Amino acid sequence: MDPASPVHAIVAEREEDVISIANYIIHENASALAPACYLQDLFVDPAKRGAGVGQALIDWLVGEMKTQSWSTLYWNTRENNYRARGLYDKYTPHSGFLRYVIKNPAT
């Protein structure tokens, strides 16, 4: 990836195999004076779920939020993604916001 890009990724490896990846975006935030971090995607190999791998990647991002002085770390998940929500609820309750998406049919 381009080092100047706001899009970043971290991975978790076990025995040289990638078992988890988190893609995140650092962006300006109109409601705060400091940048925010959007965790765009967190994927854990299904065979490795429940072993703390996803939690380790989120913990790393929380540490970076503090080190880099980001105003916020946030993400979205499906309402019925109960397994992921079990992990996410350990960090914070959901915000109550609904997400609306308009896609460009030309892309």
Language-model segments: which ranges?
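A short helix-loop-beta-strand connector motif used in the catalytic cores of GNAT acetyltransferases and
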Residues: M1-V11, Y38
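Conserved beta-hairpin
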Residues: H8-A22, D45
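Glycine-rich acyl-CoA binding loop
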Residues: A12, G50-I58
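A conserved beta-strand-loop-helix scaffold within acyl/acetyltransferase catalytic domains
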Residues: R14, Y24-S31
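Conserved hydrophobic beta-strand within the GNAT/NAT acetyltransferase core sheet
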Residues: L39, L73-T77
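A short, internal acetyl-CoA/4′-phosphopantetheine-binding micro-motif in the GNAT/acyltransferase core
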Residues: L42-R49
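Conserved acyl-CoA
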Residues: D45, A56-T72
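Conserved active-site alpha-helix within GNAT-family acetyltransferase domains
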Residues: Q55, T67, E79-L98, I102-N104
